[in-house]
């Protein structure tokens, strides 16, 4: 599986590095598809520092993903993926 992180992520969230996003994506705890076209996946995973990150990604090639949003997890995303009421 190939995971790419859009440069915009680090420009907007300087505390989140590309490797953090990849580790969180590959170790996803919970994710769900959004009703969009193309289908966007919102997910939550732990980064290499043990922080809980949220991400939004699209499959942009066979077995290839582009993460275009990532940051420290919010309550809204925890609820969206079913990890919080």
Name each model feature, range by range:
Residues 1-85:
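Ribonuclease/tRNase effector modules and their secretory precursors
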């Amino acid at each position: 599986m190939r995971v790419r992180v859009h440069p915009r992520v680090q420009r907007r969230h300087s505390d989140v590095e590309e490797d953090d996003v990849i580790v969180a994506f590959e170790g996803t705890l919970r994710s769900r598809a959004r009703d969009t076209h193309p289908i966007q996946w919102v997910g939550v995973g732990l980064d290499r520092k043990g922080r809980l990150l949220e991400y939004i990604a699209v499959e942009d090639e066979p077995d290839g993903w582009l993460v275009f949003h990532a940051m420290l997890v919010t309550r809204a995303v925890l609820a969206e993926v079913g990890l919080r009421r």
